[in-house]
């Protein structure tokens, strides 16, 4: 069997797939948009400035990490001062961002752990050897694979094309529909 962790914008799904079917699935309505929102909330509460969704996403991409990383640097952030209404610059550190997003990241990691706990024992050996596969844009958060690996003791492999993995898989299913047809017919809705 294979274990896939898909972290999208609004949801995170972890599934174990074996012999053309889903063995176990754990899905939560938490994703990378929630990480962005947590950054916005933190900057508003701790620094008194409002930032937009795009700025929060830029912060996540530039200095966001799920675990401490070597050679971390802060970033200059520009927003609107909540008191004066004027533009204001602040310096934001990676430690602050990690603190801001920790609750969201923990929910994602806990979801992976719950899915792992439902895996039949005979399949556990597969994951210990091959590991889990991380896909989706949310999986690009630096240090996330390492944090999942640390908290589950199972290797995590990043898809070489995490943003395209889901659509490529769907395309593969369409191209090979006749071969995979029995899997689709047996799928639960």
Go through the PLM ranges and name each one.
Residues 68, 124-148:
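Glycine-rich phosphate-binding loops at beta-strand->alpha-helix junctions
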Residues 146-172, 180, 187:
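Conserved phosphate-binding/catalytic loops in two-lobed NTP-binding clefts
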């Amino acid at each position: 069997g294979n274990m896939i962790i898909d972290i999208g914008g609004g949801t995170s799904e972890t599934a174990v797939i074996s012999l053309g079917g889903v063995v176990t699935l754990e899905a939560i309505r938490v994703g990378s948009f929630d990480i962005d929102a947590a950054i916005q909330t933190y900057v508003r509460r701790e620094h008194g400035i409002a930032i937009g969704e795009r700025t929060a996403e830029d912060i996540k991409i530039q200095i966001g990490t799920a675990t401490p990383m070597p050679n971390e640097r802060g970033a200059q952030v520009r927003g609107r001062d909540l008191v004066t209404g004027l533009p204001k610059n602040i310096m934001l550190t990676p430690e602050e961002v990690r603190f801001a997003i920790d609750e969201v990241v923990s929910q994602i990691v806990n979801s992976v752990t719950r899915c792992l706990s439902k895996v039949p024992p005979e399949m556990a050996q597969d994951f210990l050897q091959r590991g889990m596969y991380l896909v989706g844009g949310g999986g690009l958060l630096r240090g996330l694979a390492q944090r999942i690996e640390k908290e589950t003791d199972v290797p995590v492999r990043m898809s070489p094309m995490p943003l395209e993995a889901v659509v490529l898989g769907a395309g593969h299913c369409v191209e090979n529909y006749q071969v995979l047809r029995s899997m689709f017919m047996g799928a639960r809705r």
